[in-house]
């Protein structure tokens, strides 16, 4: 397997007329059709001719467990407001932490579960969910419990 680094990362490798062999739900082998040999346990063939097959997305840094969106702050940042100005208007991480702290674990779980399901529908196959918006031991532990529940209840 070759790893890309530096300028090579800007090149998109393409395999044309290729196969992907899936075994037990995982990619076991990839190659060119001209090199295809007899593979064991082929029970289902998907003809992807004239189609594109891309890998699933792995999101290695998410904060999926939070109380509410902060899209108004994003607009404020675009308009040039500083973080201090946003905080003075009642926004920022302190507002997020307060909203999160006021919510029950079940409420946070349902919101995060919905967000996770949307990620999966959009092609995410692996995700790392981080805490960090609790700003107190109690809230951070609540976030971690929600993350644990999501892990137990999710396919990824």
Residue ranges and their predicted role:
Residues 43-110:
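Metal-associated gating/positioning segment near the N- to mid-region
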Residues 69-77, 99-156:
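Active-site loop-helix segments enriched in His/Asp/Glu that coordinate
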């Amino acid at each position: 397997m070759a790893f890309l680094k530096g300028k090579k990362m800007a090149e998109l490798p393409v395999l044309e007329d290729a196969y992907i062999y899936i075994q037990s739900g995982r990619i076991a082998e990839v190659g060119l059709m001209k090199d295809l040999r007899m593979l064991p346990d082929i029970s289902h063939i998907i003809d992807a001719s004239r189609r594109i097959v891309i890998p699933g997305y792995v999101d290695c840094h998410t904060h999926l467990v939070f109380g509410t969106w902060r899209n108004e702050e994003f607009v404020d940042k675009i308009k040039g407001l500083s973080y201090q100005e946003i905080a003075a208007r009642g926004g920022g991480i302190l507002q997020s932490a307060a909203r999160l702290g006021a919510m029950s674990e079940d409420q946070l779980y349902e919101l995060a579960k919905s967000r996770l399901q949307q990620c999966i529908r959009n092609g995410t196959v692996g995700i790392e969910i981080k805490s960090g918006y609790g700003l107190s031991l109690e809230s951070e532990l609540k976030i971690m419990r929600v993350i644990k529940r999501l892990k137990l209840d999710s396919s990824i």
